[in-house]
Structure formats: C-alpha cells, structure tokens
C-alpha cells in the first residue's frame, strides 16, 4: 500500500488541524483501525473515513480515497486528517 497527498493541502491541514498526513498514515498500521464509506455528501468519488491509533497513541480520523494504479498498487490518497473527538475516541475504544 502506498500513500499520497497534495503537499499544499498537507500544509493547510497542519495549520488547520495540527496533524500532518505523514503522521496520519500510521492509523492504517493500527490492527484495530476502522474504515467506513463516507456517505454524508454526494461526492463525485468514493470517499472513506478511517479512525485509528498512531504510534504516538493519538486517535486520528482520516478522510481519504482508495484507488488502484495500472500496475495494481493500492493507493490511499489523503484528503484530511484531524485529532479524534472524545466521542470518536470512545467509539474507537469500544471496537478495539
């Protein structure tokens, strides 16, 4: 699995949410992470929300896309990442 993002969006995300995409990708290594299809809006693409724990033990919520490259590599394209709320932290603890 590979990760990608727009660097300008990453800088904006750090400024707005205090979370770098480089750190947020760690949630996908969490064996208890949870990914759900984001059906809140009528996006023109299939968007996902993943919640998980980073190596620094921080609950992070990531908005992202999944897609396959022509060579078959699976790509996760980061859209946004933020620290989880208290409610999201409790939800995560109940699934882990």
Regions found by a protein language model. Give the residues of each.
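Ribonuclease/tRNase effector modules and their secretory precursors
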Residues: 1-96
